[in-house]
Amino acid sequence: PFESETATVPNPILHFTCLDAAIAIKPVFERFSSVIITSGTISPLEMYPKMLGFTTVVQESYTMTLARKSFLPMIVTRGSDQGAISSGFQIRNDPAVVRNYGNLLTEFCKLTPDGVVVFFPSYLYMESIISMWQGMGILDTVWKYKLILVETPDSQETSLALETYRTACNNGRGAVLLCVARGKVSEGIDFDHHYGRTVINIGVPFQYTESRILKARLEFLRETYRIRENDFLSFDAMRHAAQCLGRVLRGKDDYGIMVLADRRFLKKRNQLPKWMQQYLPESDTNLSVDQATAIAKKFLREMSVAFPKGMQDGI
């Protein structure tokens, strides 16, 4: 009944929420005899028939045909000091972890031309990390290489930040956009070509598990569809992570670096879309910041060579 923990006057809030996604898609299945659900980032596939209440005729995840390897996915699990990096609850505010994330950002801002997009699991976590980076002098270092812009819950402010970001990328100053994995930026804004040469996922974008709405949904999924809480949370987080990474690759002649910065991604990489797994060798799944930087530099050197017209035919 209280809005916050410190409030003394009861102020009840009534939430209406749809726990069953099958309700929304049911009219589509009733009206059409054949329905195709397709996307580059709807993996792992097994969860959708369960949650939406349908049986599949064909369920397939495909790899991607590329004339050259135009994106570089990698999992960074350690900082330069070999300490583990993660947004896990126990160590998320550990100064050593925050500094390692800061070093990762600095190194990638140094080597990446034009635009860098960084996704955090939540606004709260992003704000606490930014203030700690400010105290450590990390933002001052990043500022030398890129303009720093931050997404906020206010959509007008965010639109203005995006406009400034694009201008900075166009005029050669370069920019880094700090945003949230479930915010406006991650959902429908493309960072094609020079607007997104590197995307960094800082931490696994799990939902806030203390939310009453989420708890109700998890209980519903467990009782109705026999979907375990952890399975759903993991599926949901990896789907959002893949969606964030997919923002940088928007065409056959586009290229970009995709960084998953959390040791927990190591065990979850088989939940990424097949086309990402296809270009993620074992050697790139347990990297330190220094190793990741070296691999990224090599990749960008290869990408700087002009793409011959003949290689583009038939793709």
Q: Where in this protein do the model-derived segments appear?
A:
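ASCE RecA-like P-loop NTPase motor cores
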Residues: P1-I315
